[in-house]
């Protein structure tokens, strides 16, 4: 019992910082569908620090103010290349699920995918121990990697 308490206490004193990014190639629509799960309090703190504004990501009334800030932040910290060509991410929006913000993006008009390169340094400036998990699925073939700060780039071949 004491061991469980101490383990829980240590976990509380040493929080972990992780995000998860899913990139799925939709063969039907010829697009990349991207979702990124980030703890909303960490995302909110990063946006406040970067833009010097007091924000509340949980208030729907602030969505109009937050969407452009989240878009700009993700454009800077999450970048993709497909078949050695950089692609532009189109921000679709975000939603809150429990303690996380799910941010949605897409890249339209993506034909055959042979290779995807990703740079993901989301929250690296905020947390030295930030880890960004990346999962990429093309034609049902799922590949994954873990990017530990400062390592921010990975390449996947299909």
Whereabouts are the PLM-identified features?
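Sec-dependent N-terminal signal peptides
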Residues: 3-11
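N-terminal soluble domains immediately following signal/targeting peptides that reside
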Residues: 14-158
